[in-house]
Swiss-Prot record:
The gene is tuf. Residues 19-26 are annotated as: G1. Residues 176-178 are annotated as: G5. This is Elongation factor Tu. GTP hydrolase that promotes the GTP-dependent binding of aminoacyl-tRNA to the A-site of ribosomes during protein biosynthesis. It catalyses: GTP + H2O = GDP + phosphate + H(+). Residues 62-66 are annotated as: G2. Its EC number is 3.6.5.3. Residues 83-86 are annotated as: G3.
Length: 396
C-alpha cells in the first residue's frame, strides 16, 4: 500500500525507450527498474527482465500492439515507462497514440551506432510530437576505444539535430543495461546517471487542465425557456461560467457565451478537463451547432481541411481491409466525435498501400475540422476502422 500515498505528491511523467531492435531497449528498461528498486525499495516494485520482455498484447482501436508498461519512481518523480519491443509495435504505438510520451530515451548500441530503424524512430518521434529525447549509449562496456564512443556520440547528436531535436544539448549517457542488471557497480551508477538526466532534462508535462479549454460536442439539446445545451467530455482546460467561447469546425466559426454549466443535473461554476458536462450557450438555436464541432477558448484552435498525416493501416487479421488502396481513395476520417469524408493522396513513389503498412499521406477533407498537429484520427469504411493516424502537418 505504500505506493498509493506517493502518487499525488510527485509530478507524473510518461516516458519510453525507443531505438533499433537488438540495441537493448528491453534490457535497459529492466535495468532501470532494478537499479531504482535497489536504490529506493520503498518506492518501487521488483520486476524481472522476463516480465518486461514478454510484452503483453494490447488492442488499441482494434490494432494489436505488444507493449510493456513499467512503473517506477525516483525521489523527484513518478514514471510510467513504455517499451515496445518490436519495430512494428513501436510504429503502431507511436501512430495510434496508445501510449503518449512526455519524453523518450533513444537507445543506441555503442557497438553499432545509429541504424536505419534508429533514424525512423527519431523521425516518427518528432512527427507525433514527442517533446524531448535523450540518449542512452548502451553496451558501452563492449567498446574499449574511447574515441570510437566519441564518434558514435557525435553521429547520434547529428541525427537528432537533423530531425529537429536539440542534438547539441541532449544528454548522452554511456550505459550497459546488461552489466547493470548483473549488479556491476560502475554500470549500476551509469543507469543512476541516466535517470538523473531524465529527471533533470525531460520537462514537466503541461497538465491537460492547464491547456486552453476544448470540449468536443457529442449531443445538442433544447431546454425550453433556457436555450441550447451541448454535451460532451471536456478534453482539456477549464471553463468558468459566463466565459466567451468559439464553436469550431464543419461550419464557419461562431462566438457565444456559456451561461450555464451542468454535470449530472447539478449546476457548476466551472467545467474541468476529464468531466462530462452540458454547456448552455447564449443566443444559439439547436440547428446552429452539431456533433463533431468543438467548444473552445477563443483563438486557441482553427478549422482546417488539408493536412499531412502518418497512418497505420490495419492488417486483414486485425479486421482491416483485405486489399490495397491507391491515391484518390475516399474513406471517412473520424476526428473526436464525427466522421468526415476525405480524399487521400499518397506520397510520390508510393503506388499503393497494403493492409498492415504504415505510410505518410496527404488528406483533403470535404468539411473543415478543428485541428492541430499531433491530433489523432481513425480511418473508417462503412463504420469499421481500417486505419489509425496522426496529423503531422497542417496545409490549409
Amino acid at each position: 500500500m505504500a505506493k498509493a500515498k506517493f502518487e499525488r505528491t510527485k509530478p507524473h511523467v510518461n516516458i519510453g525507450t525507443i531505438g533499433h531492435v537488438d540495441h537493448g531497449k528491453t534490457t535497459l528498461t529492466a535495468a532501470i527498474s532494478k537499479v531504482l528498486y535497489d536504490k529506493y525499495p520503498t518506492l518501487n516494485e521488483k520486476r524481472d527482465f522476463a516480465s518486461i520482455d514478454s510484452a503483453p498484447e494490447e488492442r488499441q482501436r482494434g490494432i494489436t500492439i505488444n507493449i510493456s508498461h513499467v512503473e517506477y519512481q525516483t525521489e523527484k518523480r513518478h514514471y510510467a515507462h513504455v517499451d515496445a519491443p518490436g519495430h512494428a509495435d513501436y510504429i503502431k504505438n507511436m501512430i495510434t497514440g496508445a501510449a503518449q510520451m512526455d519524453g523518450a530515451i533513444l537507445v543506441v548500441a555503442a557497438t553499432d551506432g545509429p541504424m536505419a530503424q534508429t533514424r525512423e524512430h527519431v523521425l516518427l518521434a518528432r512527427q507525433v510530437g514527442v517533446p524531448y529525447l535523450l540518449v542512452a549509449l548502451n553496451k558501452a562496456d563492449m567498446v574499449d576505444d574511447e574515441e570510437l564512443l566519441d564518434l558514435v556520440e557525435m553521429e547520434v547528436r547529428e541525427l537528432l539535430s537533423s530531425q529537429g531535436f536539440d542534438g547539441d544539448e541532449a544528454p548522452v549517457v554511456r550505459v550497459s543495461g546488461l552489466k547493470a542488471l548483473e549488479g556491476d557497480p560502475e554500470w549500476v551508477k551509469s543507469v543512476e546517471d541516466l535517470m538523473a538526466a531524465v529527471d533533470e532534462s525531460v520537462p514537466d508535462p503541461v497538465r491537460d487542465r492547464d491547456k486552453p479549454f476544448l470540449m468536443p460536442i457529442e449531443d445538442v439539446f433544447t431546454i425550453t425557456g433556457r436555450g441550447t445545451v451541448v454535451t460532451g467530455r471536456a478534453e482539456r482546460g477549464t471553463l468558468a461560467i459566463n466565459s466567451e467561447v468559439e464553436i469550431v469546425g464543419i461550419r464557419p466559426v461562431q462566438k457565444t457565451t456559456v451561461t450555464g454549466i451542468e454535470m449530472f443535473h447539478k449546476q457548476l461554476d466551472e467545467a474541468w478537463a476529464g468531466e462530462n458536462c452540458g454547456l448552455l450557450l447564449r443566443g444559439l438555436k439547436r440547428d446552429d451547432v452539431e456533433r463533431g464541432q468543438v467548444v473552445v477558448k477563443p483563438g486557441s484552435i482553427t478549422p482546417h481541411t488539408d493536412f499531412e498525416a502518418n497512418v497505420y493501416i490495419l492488417s486483414k487479421d486485425e479486421g482491416g481491409r483485405h486489399n490495397p488502396f491507391y491515391s484518390n481513395y475516399r474513406p471517412q476520417f473520424y476526428f473526436r466525435t464525427t466522421d468526415v469524408t476525405g480524399v487521400i493522396t499518397l506520397p510520390e513513389g508510393t503506388e499503393m498501400v497494403m493492409p498492415g503498412d504504415n505510410t505518410e499521406m496527404t488528406v483533403a477533407l470535404i468539411q473543415p475540422i478543428a485541428m492541430e498537429e499531433g491530433l489523432g484520427f481513425a480511418i473508417r469504411e462503412g463504420g469499421r476502422t481500417v486505419g489509425s493516424g496522426r496529423v503531422t502537418k497542417i496545409i490549409k
